[in-house]
Structures are given as structure tokens and as C-alpha cells.
């Protein structure tokens, strides 16, 4: 626990159904109890939210990743924002560890929607005054909002794990980006670990189907660490791991901030060349979706620090610079 000076303050933290364990951990780190609210569903599927304490004049923080089931968790968030606005909260700060629809951030083809922008519009219209996000799939999504966005990074948490692991020598590692779009992320991890980087050139013939083509960088004899922001069906990451093994990698580790792990992901990872998968708890991961070789790291401390700094009107940039 960081401190207990906020127990009788106007700081309120609420959790919806998206990741209650993470929200509780964040509240414990801040040193306050979670706010009292109920989230129920009517028989026809409609959501009913009731805030069970006064929040008039309070700085409210709502923790809710919009992960699976995405639409249900998004509606919970929008309804809670509206409830806080009508209950006269001073500020409504949403903490979104995982931003659903982030991969629909541009018009890849004619007549396609930009759903990431639509979600931003919905959040703002509902009444949110600030968003704390973690590793947005595309950083430019921040530009879809007219409210302040604090964009936290998961790379330092992942990097600390590899630096502290006695079985890994960073001097013998290479950080690998599974595609060209992830080079910036891979470079950040490589800078912290002081390792070289490599890039996998992949082609995706259709959604959720990836084909690894070739590898740019020195791999042979090194421990490869693949880093991505999201692992969904795990097609990309497992094909990348096998390609690295074929190129002479000694061992292959994989890491990501957001373990979506849908469909065949669990089976693919367990049967792949990946020795260990390191993820964060930005998304609640049921045991039946978690591969047996998974290590989960907590982002609660990072989020708790961000909440305290926002509440105290202090700079948040020290957390992601």
C-alpha cells in the first residue's frame, strides 16, 4: 500500500465488471476502499448501474478495460460515466487498461468505419473528463479525443522482469518486433535491456491469419524476446517463434501488455517454440484461457501512481518518459 492519506478525501475509485481484481489491487495500492456501486443486468440484457454512495464534488476514477465481452464492458463504462455526471462528480476520470476497438483506427479499405474514433466520441459525449490508458494499439488514438489522455507504457514493467530473471542474460538477447508497426515498442525494450533488435517481415492475407516471411537482424545463438502490445489468436507470435528457432535462436520468450488470447491462442502457445509468455493483468484472464507457460505481471502500481498524480494535480509524465 502506498499510503492511507486518501481514506477521507474526495478521491473515489470504482470498479465495473471488466477487471475487478486489478481494480481492487489498485485501490489497495492507493490506500482506499473501492467505491460502492452495483452492476446488474435485466432479463433482456439491459445494464443497470447504481452508485451507492455520494460522489458530489468528488474526483471519480472508473477502472474498466473494454476487453471481452467488449460491447458489454463498453456499455457498462458509458452508463457509469453518465451516472457519475448526473450525480455531480467534480471530475470523471476513466482508467482503461485495455482500449477495445483500438485496432480499427483507420480506413484500411473503402467503406470501412473508424470504430476507435467512434468509441472516443461515445466516451466524450457520455461525460468523461480524462482518460488514463495503457499501451494503446496506435498512440495516435489519443488524437481522437479532445479530453486529456495520460498514456502509460507497459514496456518498463516487462523489461524489469527480464532484467530480474536469473535465467536470462540480457547481453545474449535480441528483442524482436513481430512486424514493422511494433519497431518503436521493441526499440524501447531493447534500449532498457541494452540489446540489439530484429524485425520479422510478415504478410497477413486476411484477418486473424498471419504468415511469417523473413527476419531482419542477427538471431543465431541468442535468446529472442518477442514483444507485442496485443496477443489475440497467437498466430503471429507462434509463427514468429518458430521462425526464430529455425534461424538458430537459443530460446524464445514472448511478452505483451494485453493478453486477449482468443480462440485457439492457448493451444497454439502451449504447442509452440515459446518457452515462456510474459503478460500483464491489464485484461482479466480466466484460467481456461491462460497457457500453462504464462507469467502474469501486475500494472496496479503504475495505475495507482497515475491516479494519485492526477488527483494531486501533479505531472504524470515521469511515469512514461
From Swiss-Prot:
ATP binds at residues 44-46, 103-104. Pfam families: Pribosyl_synth, Pribosyltran_N. Binds 2 Mg(2+) ions per subunit. SUPFAM superfamilies: PRTase-like. HAMAP family: RibP_PPkinase_B. Involved in the biosynthesis of the central metabolite phospho-alpha-D-ribosyl-1-pyrophosphate (PRPP) via the transfer of pyrophosphoryl group from ATP to 1-hydroxyl of ribose-5-phosphate (Rib-5-P). This is Ribose-phosphate pyrophosphokinase. It comes from Staphylococcus aureus (strain COL). The lineage of its organism: Bacteria, Bacillati, Bacillota, Bacilli, Bacillales.
Amino acid at each position: 500500500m502506498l499510503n492511507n492519506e486518501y481514506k477521507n478525501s474526495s478521491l473515489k475509485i470504482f470498479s465495473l465488471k471488466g477487471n475487478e481484481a486489478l481494480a481492487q489491487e489498485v485501490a489497495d495500492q492507493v490506500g482506499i476502499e473501492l467505491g460502492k456501486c452495483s452492476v446488474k443486468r435485466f432479463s433482456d440484457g439491459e445494464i443497470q448501474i447504481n452508485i451507492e454512495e455520494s460522489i458530489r464534488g468528488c474526483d471519480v476514477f472508473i477502472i474498466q478495460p473494454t476487453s471481452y465481452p467488449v460491447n458489454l464492458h463498453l456499455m457498462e463504462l458509458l452508463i457509469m460515466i453518465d451516472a457519475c455526471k448526473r450525480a455531480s462528480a467534480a471530475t470523471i476520470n476513466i482508467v482503461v487498461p485495455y482500449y477495445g476497438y483500438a485496432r480499427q483506427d483507420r480506413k484500411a479499405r473503402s467503406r470501412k468505419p473508424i470504430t476507435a474514433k467512434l468509441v472516443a466520441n461515445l466516451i466524450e459525449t457520455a461525460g468523461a473528463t480524462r482518460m488514463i490508458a495503457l499501451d494503446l494499439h496506435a498512440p495516435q488514438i489519443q488524437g481522437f479525443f479532445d479530453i486529456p489522455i495520460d498514456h502509460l507504457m507497459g514496456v518498463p514493467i516487462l523489461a524489469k522482469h527480464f532484467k530480474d530473471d536469473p535465467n536470462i542474460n540480457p547481453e545474449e538477447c535480441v528483442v524482436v518486433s513481430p512486424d514493422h508497426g511494433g519497431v518503436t515498442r521493441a526499440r524501447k525494450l531493447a534500449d532498457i535491456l541494452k540489446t540489439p533488435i530484429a524485425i520479422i517481415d510478415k504478410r497477413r492475407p486476411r484477418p486473424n491469419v498471419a504468415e511469417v516471411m523473413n527476419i531482419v537482424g542477427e538471431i543465431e545463438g541468442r535468446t529472442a524476446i518477442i514483444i507485442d502490445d496485443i496477443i489475440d489468436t497467437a498466430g503471429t507470435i507462434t509463427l514468429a517463434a518458430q521462425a526464430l528457432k529455425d534461424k538458430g535462436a537459443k530460446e524464445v520468450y514472448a511478452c505483451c501488455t494485453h493478453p486477449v488470447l482468443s480462440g485457439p491462442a492457448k493451444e497454439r502457445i502451449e504447442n509452440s517454440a515459446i518457452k515462456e509468455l510474459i503478460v500483464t493483468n491489464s485484461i482479466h484472464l480466466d484460467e481456461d484461457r491462460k497457457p500453462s507457460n504464462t507469467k502474469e505481471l501486475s500494472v496496479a502500481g503504475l495505475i495507482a501512481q497515475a491516479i494519485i498524480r492526477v488527483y494531486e494535480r501533479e505531472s504524470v509524465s515521469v511515469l512514461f518518459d
